[in-house]
């Protein structure tokens, strides 16, 4: 067993720029951390521009024959830093009690905490693995999905998987995610016939039809929520005509909507419902389902996480399904999956930062979770 400082590990990862889609140096850095701990490393690059190339890493340290297998999943890619940082986004900086840098909380910090945690777990405790992608913040086409394919080819499916997304809100340990709503985006087009505004009888203006279509969609009440999920919501996210002329009736009007939905629906059902309304207004729909809703019902796995959090923080975490999508939506097809990590207040913001003490507490929480999962 080795004693590693999660703050130092986080600094090393932050110092490797890894804007999504990520490849290269940041994976070299993680590999250099894991190999001395006895992990066998599998790395591969998938996809092509514009959504790739993407690097992925699966690291496994096998325990005794028949031992339980606990996996930690996460991502090394980060969103672009933007402007206005008070220090370099890809040069970790300690100021006061905080560690600054892009990825500090989302989610290089939690990866560092888990590496430090497993360094304290003996090899004979069971099988441990890391499922790490460079394609979570982007389209997520070439990341966790092909990683799952590799894991199945290796016959290395875990019994339980913890995703290290920053789930905490006000204090480390106040929230654990046991599920997520599904997500579907749709592009709607109403076509007409271009013409002069002074001769409307010679044209077909698609805008009134699109406006009426969107009004029908906006009036929908999808549900009132379920036991573990908030109500589904449909949002109009874009309107486009692309008509710079004041005297021209356009030939086409377009809109985009996004639906976040709970376990009362499937993506396909919602697409069909929108298509039915769109067809009444002579509209066409193209849809992309990003993921279905899922839940790991409260039970032994969530209890061991809650117990670990309570032991180290004194908090009783809320079990929640709020928030956006994550790669847990893919991993749930392999084994039970729960998400827990750092406070998310500064994720995707300038001057992203994590309390250094939170990294050390998270290391201890993760160690407790892993040992419980392997027992």
Swiss-Prot record:
One of its GO terms (biological process) is lysine biosynthetic process via diaminopimelate. It is an enzyme of class 3 (hydrolase). GO terms for molecular function: acetylornithine deacetylase activity; cobalt ion binding; succinyl-diaminopimelate desuccinylase activity; zinc ion binding. It comes from the Bacteria. InterPro entries: ArgE/DapE_CS, Bact_exopeptidase_dim_dom, DapE_proteobac, Peptidase_M20, Peptidase_M20_dimer, Peptidase_M20A. Binds 2 Zn(2+) or Co(2+) ions per subunit. Zn(2+) 1 binds at residues 75, 106, 165. It catalyses: N-succinyl-(2S,6S)-2,6-diaminopimelate + H2O = (2S,6S)-2,6-diaminopimelate + succinate. Zn(2+) 2 binds at residues 106, 137, 348. CDD domains: M20_DapE_proteobac. Pfam families: M20_dimer, Peptidase_M20. The active site is at 77, 136 (proton acceptor). Its EC number is 3.5.1.18. Pathway: Amino-acid biosynthesis; L-lysine biosynthesis via DAP pathway; LL-2,6-diaminopimelate from (S)-tetrahydrodipicolinate (succinylase route): step 3/3. Keywords: Amino-acid biosynthesis, Cobalt, Diaminopimelate biosynthesis, Hydrolase, Lysine biosynthesis, Metal-binding, Zinc. Belongs to the peptidase M20A family. DapE subfamily. Homodimer. Catalyzes the hydrolysis of N-succinyl-L,L-diaminopimelic acid (SDAP), forming succinate and LL-2,6-diaminopimelate (DAP), an intermediate involved in the bacterial biosynthesis of lysine and meso-diaminopimelic acid, an essential component of bacterial cell walls. This is Succinyl-diaminopimelate desuccinylase.
């Amino acid at each position: 067993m080795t004693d590693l400082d999660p703050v130092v590990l986080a600094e090393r990862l932050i110092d490797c720029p890894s804007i999504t889609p990520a490849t290269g140096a940041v994976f070299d850095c993680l590999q250099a951390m894991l190999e001395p701990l006895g992990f066998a490393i599998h790395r591969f690059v998938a996809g092509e521009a514009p959504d790739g190339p993407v690097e992925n890493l699966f690291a496994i340290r096998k325990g005794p024959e028949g031992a339980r297998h606990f996996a930690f999943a996460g991502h090394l890619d980060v969103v672009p830093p933007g402007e206005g940082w008070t220090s370099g986004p890809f040069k970790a900086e300690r100021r006061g009690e905080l560690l600054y840098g892009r990825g500090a909380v989302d989610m290089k910090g939690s990866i560092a905490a888990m590496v430090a945690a497993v360094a304290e777990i003996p090899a004979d405790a069971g099988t441990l693995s890391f499922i790490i992608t460079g394609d979570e913040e982007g389209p997520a086409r070439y990341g966790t999905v092909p990683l799952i394919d590799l894991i199945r080819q290796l016959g290395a499916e875990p019994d339980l998987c913890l995703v290290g997304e920053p789930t905490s809100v006000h204090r480390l340990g106040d929230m654990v995610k046991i599920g997520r709503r599904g997500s579907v985006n749709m592009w709607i087009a109403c076509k007409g016939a271009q013409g002069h505004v002074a001769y409307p009888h010679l044209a077909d203006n698609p805008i009134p039809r699109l406006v009426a279509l969107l009004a029908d969609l906006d009036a929908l009440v999808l549900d009132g929520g379920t036991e573990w999920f908030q109500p589904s919501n449909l949002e109009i996210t874009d309107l486009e005509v692309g008509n710079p002329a004041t005297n021209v009736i356009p030939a086409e009007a377009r809109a985009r909507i996004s639906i976040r939905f709970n376990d009362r629906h499937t993506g396909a059902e919602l697409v069909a419902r929108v298509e039915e309304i769109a067809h009444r207004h002579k509209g066409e729909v193209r849809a992309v389902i990003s993921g279905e809703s899922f839940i790991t019902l409260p039970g032994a796995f969530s209890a061991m996480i809650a117990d670990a959090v309570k032991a180290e923080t004194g908090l009783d975490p809320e079990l929640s399904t709020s928030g956006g999508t994550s790669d847990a939506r893919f991993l749930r097809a392999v084994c039970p999956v729960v998400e827990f990590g750092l406070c998310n207040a500064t994720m995707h913001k300038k001057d992203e930062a994590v309390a250094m003490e939170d990294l050390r507490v998270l290391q201890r929480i993760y160690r407790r979770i892993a040992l419980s999962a392997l027992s």
